[in-house]
């Protein structure tokens, strides 16, 4: 596809979501020919994710909070994961509405929902990294770590939230509502004449310390954890880790594609990778598609707990029995059938 050199045909500012002011006077604009994703499909997807996340994560938090006596260290981490997903889910109606007429909610909401999106992502991977370290120390080194003391776990979680806020702060500071010529308003970073330089900083540094480093920590810890479990033939403990492994896998499947496409977009914006109209169109569409996948993650963890976490199901039934919604006989039968698959001091109550 050849570039269209007439600047009246296409304004670089018109690019959606990741659009930014021109960074090079010699840049030759091109017409965006790739079809965008059907906005109604996106809206319906966001609406379903919002409802499922609101219901599912509320139930997860309820089950964990009800199990005061038997709450494990991992439960505290998963409680914070559910809280992060729940807070992000509250912004999904706004993201859905922005797909219709662009960003019509002003600069303040642009900053707030962008902050919640980034905090949800970073807190998620940091908490999962903490779980991996805790499981590594408990299984590989067979020791009760400092995080076994519940009050210290709370400080670790507060540290994860604080670091997530710091990594996400640039999006709160620099994002604003912007209305390009001949296009719908957008919500993105406005960084002045040094947009290219600062965009690289704002993307590479947070994703290095908020994604790549925690990812390698998880790969290291779970690699040695699995090795220890298989060598020792610890089948029961291996089954107890299924929920945690599933949570980590789903997180990576949902967010890794978006971050890889975002990296490609950044490298093209900063001229590290040569940009062409075809590449720009493909990356723009890929960003839209993978962003939806990332947003869907907020409703998936409760589904994992419901299908894999036997103790989560039992905890939920216990709450129902306390309120007379199921019989105690049914609860007792469920406890007997799930007893052989439960674990002690290895996994969470989920």
Curated annotation (Swiss-Prot):
Interacts with IL8. Interacts with GNAI2. One of its GO terms (biological process) is immune response. Residues 1-39, 97-111, 175-199, 265-285 are extracellular. This is C-X-C chemokine receptor type 1. Glycans are attached at residues 3, 16. It is found in: Cell membrane. The lineage of its organism: Eukaryota, Metazoa, Chordata, Craniata, Vertebrata. Residues 67-75, 134-154, 221-242, 309-350 are cytoplasmic. Signal peptide: none annotated. Receptor to interleukin-8, which is a powerful neutrophils chemotactic factor. Binding of IL-8 to the receptor causes activation of neutrophils. This response is mediated via a G-protein that activates a phosphatidylinositol-calcium second messenger system. Belongs to the G-protein coupled receptor 1 family. Coiled coil: none annotated. Pfam families: 7tm_1. The chain crosses the membrane at residues 40-66, 76-96, 112-133, 155-174, 200-220, 243-264, 286-308. It comes from the Eukaryota. Gene3D superfamilies: Rhodopsin 7-helix transmembrane proteins. PROSITE patterns: G_PROTEIN_RECEP_F1_1, G_PROTEIN_RECEP_F1_2. GO terms for cellular component: external side of plasma membrane. SUPFAM superfamilies: Family A G protein-coupled receptor-like. The keyword Amino-acid biosynthesis does not apply. Disulfide bonds join 110-187. Keywords: Cell membrane, Chemotaxis, Disulfide bond, G-protein coupled receptor, Glycoprotein, Membrane, Receptor, Transducer, Transmembrane, Transmembrane helix. It is a multi-pass membrane protein. GO terms for molecular function: C-C chemokine binding; C-C chemokine receptor activity; C-X-C chemokine receptor activity; interleukin-8 binding.
